[in-house]
Amino acid sequence: MALSREEVAARYGTALFGYAQDNKVLDTVYDEMMALKKAAIANPKFISVLSDPILSSKDKKSILTAVEKDFSDEVQGFLNLLLEYNRFADLIDIIDQFSLLYDNENKIASGTATTAVKLDDDQLERLSESFAKKYDLNAVRLENKVDPSILGGVILQVKDRVIDGSVKNKLKKIRAQIIDEN
């Protein structure tokens, strides 16, 4: 029975996480995997070439050798394992699973800050720090989405929490309160 993409990602991501943790190179492996993900997204042919069933294993290995030379032994070994077991097509999903485990281990959360206008880096950083402190997290990675319809304020979405501090929501509450009073 073939494994689903999610099952493959869970198994390989968990294995990489455990291996990196056991060898005390978790931060290094995390940084390298994030760099690899960024490069793979910027150049999608990288994954498709290393996943191509027509290309010989020798050719794939030579391509991978050129790419992996700047990575740690742990990441090189992992990439060779993916190549050996024909799992390169699942690379991004595996990295995402690994990243999720890393974030959980380090009390890091990711989320979205929706605002009427784009926040600068300093504002986004202060918002992240404030949320992290309030919810006892080490860090919060926020992506800023712009939605002029919220009029002002911010809507924070991190994990299963939503904090709606938008002007649109406040006006909606005031309106509901006025209607209820009548």
Curated annotation (Swiss-Prot):
Membrane topology recorded in Swiss-Prot or TrEMBL: Peripheral membrane protein
Major localization listed first in the record, in broad terms: membrane
CC terms in the record's Gene Ontology section: plasma membrane; proton-transporting ATP synthase complex
Entry annotated with the keyword ATP-binding: no
Induction: By low pH.
Superkingdom: Bacteria
Gene3D superfamilies the record matches: N-terminal domain of the delta subunit of the F1F0-ATP synthase
Assembly with partners or alone: F-type ATPases have 2 components, F(1) - the catalytic core - and F(0) - the membrane proton channel. F(1) has five subunits: alpha(3), beta(3), gamma(1), delta(1), epsilon(1). F(0) has three main subunits: a(1), b(2) and c(10-14). The alpha and beta chains form an alternating ring which encloses part of the gamma chain. F(1) is attached to F(0) by a central stalk formed by the gamma and epsilon chains, while a peripheral stalk is formed by the delta and b chains.
Function: F(1)F(0) ATP synthase produces ATP from ADP in the presence of a proton or sodium gradient. F-type ATPases consist of two structural domains, F(1) containing the extramembraneous catalytic core and F(0) containing the membrane proton channel, linked together by a central stalk and a peripheral stalk. During catalysis, ATP synthesis in the catalytic domain of F(1) is coupled via a rotary mechanism of the central stalk subunits to proton translocation.
Name listed for the protein in its UniProt record: ATP synthase subunit delta
